[in-house]
């Protein structure tokens, strides 16, 4: 315990009511957040002579200050605890690394509804189906639905400006409601209803209706229509046959846990309407010495209760681990959902099968993760040996991307002892430089990244500069001129240049901008980690550049042309069937659009060409 913290005096001031406490170190950083039914009793336990674990001993040794927030109820304390954990990310708490909201499939409330992927708040009018474990699962489902039930998936801006059907209609993936006469209102509404039933897990109803329609078409001698519906029936059956379905038809999340070598994996199965929608593995950040029970309890609390990213709650949650606060968690979730949420730890029947599946997936994912981590550790150890460093705990790499000097973006990617640390990847929009001046771009991004206060834990051991001698010289100059409080001499600056034919394995490394560089064997683990972080940085930079370029392209094409306001833009896009059609049009064709003069048509033509 810190010499400056008087635990005895502090405990005299603490109430026995429920609440949340925050522990701070000497630097004023929150290092632990906890909740208690009885604050005085819980906080007193930290200052006994025989502490429960080495982790608690290490925590107490750093306490400089404790703040307490009293709450009305335990439920209130539980919610506040997880909001504080998300806000402060304390190093001694178990932390859920990936807290992105889950994607849903959105069926809009338009006259001709569209299907789309949706994340975040549900403000738009329509229906939401899910959650799905990730964006890939949603995209895969949307692609499947497009083949079976061809309702539109295009943006409203495209749909409202079509004068002729797009390629999706030509290949049978859309009914073409954008163009009058291609599909009746009744037929489109029927396909939308099939989608609604299918996504709600009511496959039997879909099949019953389709079979009835097929028989009617056959009796009316509409054999082509009957054959089309038959194909639809077969497609639905192929999908449903692959899906293990529970007889209960309930919505539930199933959580399996595996723990080994100080790492935990929590695997969540998402089951809606009795069907497995998908699953996802989580690897929470676990401080050394943490008990598995704390990992599970903290994960479940963070997963469902944290702030604005609160998950969509199923009717039941299955766990393969007993929770000490199971009743409190169930009551808190029920209060949030406005309905009864059951938390069950000893299921039977189908539920037991689901739990076994989640447990198996957790164990498999953990083995894979530990194997990957072992490989990363070996590579970083090899790199430290090559660079003559005691160890490499953190690396950062920079790359620049642009098109002919325009829309320049710099990327910074971060690796730690476990590999890519994607939560800390950053992109920087580069401005105020001569177009195409990569040296100036590198100079700017390094000053923005390192010309400020940096926590000691965030100071990299190695900074990799993609681009060779010239870019390395820029980095050296920047660091020589930095006026910062942290140790700017700690990071090793390393330049990397590809060979003449830019093939992997022919990289040359530079410690200094002058003189000869050196190469590593193609099978060197140290080279492999350099290639990995360099490629990550390159991909991250290109991705940012493409987004920026697309944004500029989409907003500037027509909006910057004088004399073309919102109404004329809409008329041009509608008449030409979109921006691409307008780009391909001649001056004479543009001049035929109502409200467009010959002179304005020429201006539009040349603006789009250049």
From Swiss-Prot:
Domain GIY-YIG: 16-94
GO CC annotations on file: cytoplasm; excinuclease repair complex
InterPro entries with a match to the protein in the record: GIY-YIG_endonuc, GIY-YIG_endonuc_sf, GIY-YIG_UvrC_Cho, Hlx-hairpin-Hlx_DNA-bd_motif, RuvA_2-like, UVR_dom, UVR_dom_sf, UvrABC_protein_C
Record has Protein transport as a keyword: no
First-listed, main subcellular location of the protein, grouped into a coarse class: cytoplasm
Keywords: Cytoplasm, DNA damage, DNA excision, DNA repair, Excision nuclease, SOS response
PROSITE patterns: GIY_YIG, UVR, UVRC
Compartments reported by the entry: Cytoplasm
GO BP term, example: SOS response
CDD domains found in the cross-reference section: GIY-YIG_UvrC_Cho (cd10434)
Coiled-coil parts of chain: none
Gene Ontology MF terms: DNA binding; excinuclease ABC activity
Gene3D superfamilies: 5' to 3' exonuclease, C-terminal subdomain (1.10.150.20), GIY-YIG endonuclease (3.40.1440.10), UVR domain (4.10.860.10), UvrC, RNAse H endonuclease domain (3.30.420.340)
Keyword check for DNA repair: yes
Domain UVR: start-end pairs: 204-239
Entry's family note: Belongs to the UvrC family.
Subunit structure: Interacts with UvrB in an incision complex.
UniProt cross-references to NCBIfam families, sorted A to Z: PRK00558.1-5, uvrC
Function: The UvrABC repair system catalyzes the recognition and processing of DNA lesions. UvrC both incises the 5' and 3' sides of the lesion. The N-terminal half is responsible for the 3' incision and the C-terminal half is responsible for the 5' incision.
PANTHER family: UVRABC SYSTEM PROTEIN C, UVRC/OXIDOREDUCTASE
Name of the protein: UvrABC system protein C
Organism for this UniProt entry: Shigella boydii serotype 18 (strain CDC 3083-94 / BS512)
Gene symbol of the encoding locus: uvrC
